[in-house]
């Protein structure tokens, strides 16, 4: 087939020149990050105008035809080379339509954020519950007397309803994240859920818990270890804190005490660390050294949810801070990640269009279930879907379909963006609050993501490389 049709380099192929014989390429929709030598780059560049395969043979007569065939076939399979006249964005839109038509089946549910408690023992300066909400439903339910603590019976009931629905949609896995408030203010429910599903064989369940860590005890640590529950602790820096207990004292002593317990039991520990206007001045590599001391495996950098951060701070300064910490972590055996890094991982993949969601499960891939059964997109979102008492109605409601579609549909302003197939943009809660429209593209945040991803690509040391001599 390739012999008889005109071929063309996709307009969605992006090039970053490394040196005179190294070019890094990725596709805005399909990913497939790779490096090519100058000869392969010239072959691909020649296809910026439509050509027959015989045209390529003639233009590059010094390269064996079999090698050219290998090159063309390889990059055709990756989606980098297309047929002349092929409408890639139309194919992308058709893929979106097919997924929208399946949303009501529950297929899009990849995760449950189980808000077991809306109580918290801390009073953090920049907690999003104090600033990000923007819907009447959030105003009603956040402090509702019956929406503070989830009973074990309700938790299991909610999970059962989701499992029964998604296995009919042929989903094989479900992530359950215990969330709050502070989830450990309701340890009883967490313990009951873990025990109830210890022999679950209908699908694979992965757990995690997001906690400030202050209430961790040896028993809790052992239980979380027993059920392979990663402990994601909210922690920004060993030098200074904006996280305070309700009596106004700094939280660092509590953090250290909990980390010592978790280290003793060899729990998997990750930090959620916020890089924001509040933490910018003291956010540095010290957190990696601190993490090493307590066997913390991973640091997730959460970028500021407030869009003004990307206007008020120099983007190069933000990117440099992230890259410095990322590379320092690599050098010291600590994984440094974040939603920004998931975008990068998506670009490394081939044909990544088929995954469940792009970066954050909250952007179309999860149900955030509150204690009394009301459901939102995320604890950090005001997007309200309904109640677990009517899961079928919830999945067919206009708002759920709109949010679930957001996992694979971006703003129309993203059409020509190099990250369109890999990035979900700024946090939904921030977009809701600032713009009142989850399809809005915040330019400041987008400019930061593009700059950060390009820096990661430029500095990556382990990229698959194609050389003309190795294509025989």
UniProtKB/Swiss-Prot annotation:
Binding site for [4Fe-4S] cluster 2: 414, 417, 423, 446
Keywords from the named record: 4Fe-4S, Iron, Iron-sulfur, Lyase, Metal-binding, S-adenosyl-L-methionine
Cofactor: [4Fe-4S] cluster
Record note on cofactor: Binds 2 auxiliary [4Fe-4S] clusters that are seen in the crystal. One cluster is coordinated by 4 cysteine residues, and the other one by 1 tyrosine and 3 cysteine residues. Most likely binds a third typical [4Fe-4S] cluster in the radical SAM core domain, but density for this cluster is absent in all forms of the TigE crystals.
Protein family (similarity comment): Belongs to the radical SAM superfamily.
Residues bound to [4Fe-4S] cluster 3: 339, 360, 378, 427
Entry EC no(s): 4.1.-.-
Residues with site note (May act as a redox switch): 339
Pfam family, any one: Radical_SAM
GO molecular function: 4 iron, 4 sulfur cluster binding; lyase activity; metal ion binding; oxidoreductase activity
Effect of residue 339 to A/F/C: Loss of catalytic activity but no change in iron and sulfide content
PROSITE patterns per UniProt: RADICAL_SAM (PS51918)
Statement: the UniProt record of this protein carries the keyword Metal-binding: yes
Superkingdom of origin: Bacteria
Name of this chain's protein: Radical SAM cyclopropyl synthase TigE
Organism this protein belongs to: Paramaledivibacter caminithermalis (strain DSM 15212 / CIP 107654 / DViRD3) (Clostridium caminithermale)
Recorded catalytic activity of this chain's protein: L-isoleucyl-[protein] + AH2 + 2 S-adenosyl-L-methionine = methylcyclopropylglycine-[protein] + 2 5'-deoxyadenosine + 2 L-methionine + A + 2 H(+)
Entry binding sites for [4Fe-4S] cluster 1: 120, 124, 127
Function: Radical S-adenosylmethionine (SAM) enzyme that catalyzes the formation of methylcyclopropylglycine (mCPG) residues from isoleucine residues residing in the repeating TIGSVS motif of the precursor peptide TigB. Is thus involved in the maturation of a ribosomally synthesized and post-translationally modified peptide (RiPP).
Domain Radical SAM core: 106-331
């Amino acid at each position: 087939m390739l012999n008889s049709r005109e071929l063309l380099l996709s307009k969605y192929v992006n090039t970053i020149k490394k040196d005179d014989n190294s070019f890094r390429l990725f596709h805005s929709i399909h990913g497939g990050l790779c490096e090519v030598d100058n000869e392969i780059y010239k072959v691909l560049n020649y296809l910026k105008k439509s050509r027959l395969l015989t045209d390529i043979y003639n233009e590059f007569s010094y390269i064996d035809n079999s090698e050219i065939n290998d090159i063309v076939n390889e990059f055709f399979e990756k989606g980098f080379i297309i047929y002349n006249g092929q409408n890639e964005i139309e194919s992308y839109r058709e893929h979106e339509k097919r997924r929208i038509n399946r949303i009501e089946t529950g297929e899009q549910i990849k995760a449950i954020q189980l808000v077991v408690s809306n109580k918290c023992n801390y009073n953090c300066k920049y907690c999003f519950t104090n600033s990000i909400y923007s819907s009447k439903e959030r105003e009603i339910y956040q402090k509702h007397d019956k929406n503070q603590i989830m009973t074990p019976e309700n938790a299991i009931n909610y999970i059962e309803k989701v499992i029964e629905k998604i296995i009919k949609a042929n989903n094989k896995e479900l992530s359950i994240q215990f969330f709050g408030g502070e989830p450990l203010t309701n340890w009883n429910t967490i313990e009951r859920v873990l025990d109830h599903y210890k022999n679950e064989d209908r699908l694979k369940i992965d757990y995690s818990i997001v906690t400030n860590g202050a209430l961790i005890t040896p028993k809790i640590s052992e239980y979380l270890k027993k059920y392979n529950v990663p402990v994601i602790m909210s922690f920004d820096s060993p030098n200074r804190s904006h996280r305070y207990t309700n009596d106004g004292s700094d939280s660092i002593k509590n953090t250290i005490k909990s980390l010592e317990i978790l280290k003793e039991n060899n729990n998997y520990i990750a930090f959620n660390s916020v890089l924001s206007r509040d933490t910018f001045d003291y956010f540095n590599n010290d957190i990696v050294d601190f993490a090493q001391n307590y066997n913390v495996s991973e640091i997730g950098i959460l970028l500021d949810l407030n869009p003004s951060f990307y206007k008020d701070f120099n983007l190069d300064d933000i990117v440099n801070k992230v890259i410095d910490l990322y590379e320092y972590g690599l050098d010291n055996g600590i994984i440094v990640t974040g939603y920004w890094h998931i975008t990068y991982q998506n670009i490394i993949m081939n044909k990544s269009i088929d995954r469940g969601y792009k970066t954050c499960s909250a952007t179309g891939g999860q149900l955030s279930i509150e204690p009394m059964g009301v459901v939102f997109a995320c604890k950090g979102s005001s997007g309200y879907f309904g109640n677990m008492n009517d899961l079928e109605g919830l999945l067919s409601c206009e708002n759920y379909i709109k949010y679930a579609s957001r996992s694979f549909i971006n703003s129309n302003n993203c059409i020509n963006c190099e990250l369109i197939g890999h990035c979900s943009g700024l946090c939904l809660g921030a977009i809701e609050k600032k713009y009142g429209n989850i399809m809005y593209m915040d330019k400041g945040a987008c400019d930061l993501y593009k700059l950060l991803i390009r820096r990661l690509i430029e500095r990556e040391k382990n990229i698959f490389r194609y050389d003309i001599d190795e294509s025989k």
